[in-house]
Amino acid sequence: ESPSPLEDPGCVGLMENMKQDEHGFLFHYLLPFSENRFLLEVTRFTPEKVPWDRMEHDLAGALEGYGFSHAVEKRREKGILPMGLPTQKQPTGPRWAIAGTRGGAIRPATGYAFQRIAEWAESCARSIAEDGCVLSQPCFPRSIRWMDDLFLRLLRGKPELGPQLFMRFAGRLSPGQ
């Protein structure tokens, strides 16, 4: 929470301040909730785990960069999203399901999963209500897995291209996407 109002509380910052350094590809999400409340997420896209003290340093720098060095922290989360994991063998039987991260819900090249998990949960609940069967998380199509694998291999081999590649992708999206 910021003691002074945000510059534009109606503007969301997605993948801002992108840069590549010795710890990987870094960017920020800034999601305002009101004139003075916001969520600031510092994200690292890297094949190696980044030490938490480095992430704390990155967060302090982001707060200062946005002019929020006097903000009051109300809640903190931290986590690691494993990306590019091999697809797990799906169990058989009406009472078993693999879902979420282990079920392949995370898009390997982006880390996004929320919409896929929500859609799976809805169809799984409907299936349970209709015939008592639990559904596993559906796999991404082979073409998507191939493209994401190619993208991740490119980033591993040439990590300095991260900001440029993500900006190129973002430039081709509409606001609704």
Regions from the PLM with identified roles:
Residues 20-22, 46-124:
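FAD/FMN-dependent oxidoreductases across multiple families
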Residues 37-38:
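Hydrophobic residues embedded in beta-strands of well-ordered beta-sheets
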Residues 8, 68-73, 176-177:
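Short, surface-exposed acidic
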Residues 1-15, 68, 79-82:
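Central beta-strand plus flanking loop segment that forms part of the substrate or channel wall
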Residues 24-27:
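Short, surface-exposed coil-to-beta transition loops
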Residues 31-34:
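A short, hydrophobic, proline-anchored segment that marks a local hinge/packing element in signaling
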Residues 122-177:
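C-terminal helical "tail/cap" subdomain of flavin- and related membrane-associated enzymes
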